[in-house]
Design a protein with these regions (language model features):
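Conserved catalytic core of the tyrosine transesterase superfamily
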Residues: 1-162
Length: 162
């Protein structure tokens, strides 16, 4: 199963153009599944059953993994076994029967005006790094973009003619 997982991660990267974070998460999830199944005596993709995957899901629940982690693991397994079906390794996807747990959505915490002021005044503006950090914090605060979006910005994304 190790080779199939490696090929799947390469497929995600080369064909689907997934982010590095997605690839790392999927690989971690699938390696955890592979280890669990190996302990159960299942070491080939062709031998994996829906019952095996259901047992793995119950194991994750017993180990007190968060609902969001279990949900992502199920998504990883579904995608992996769908890939195996497309490659002709399986006739049907054993992960299709898995149901993701309900994820409780928590509202993000809100900073007070004082906390925002304190945060925005942290960078020392007498250095280039401080000016950069201040600009990044101001952009995050003013627009609400995610940190991953901020990090992904390129110079050509910025309108310098304002």
């Amino acid at each position: 199963m190790k080779c199939e997982i490696e090929e799947f991660i390469a497929y995600l990267h080369n064909t689907k153009g997934t982010s590095k974070n997605t690839e790392v998460s999927y690989e971690r999830d699938l390696r955890k599944m592979e280890q669990f199944l190996g302990n159960e005596g299942v070491d080939r993709v062709q031998n994996v059953t829906a019952t095996n995957l259901n047992s793995f899901e119950m194991y994750l629940e017993r180990e007190k993994f968060a609902a969001s982690t279990i949900s992502r693991s199920i998504a990883s397994m579904r995608a992996f076994f769908q890939y195996c079906c497309q490659q002709g390794l399986l006739l049907e996807n054993p992960a299709d029967i898995l149901k993701a747990p309900k994820i409780e959505k928590k509202m993000p915490g809100i900073l007070t005006v004082e906390e925002v002021d304190l945060l925005l005044n942290q960078p020392k503006e007498n250095t280039a790094k401080g000016v950069r950090d201040k600009a990044m914090l101001e952009l995050l605060y003013a627009t609400g973009i995610r940190v991953s979006e901020l990090i992904g910005l390129k110079l050509e994304n910025i309108n310098l003619k304002l």
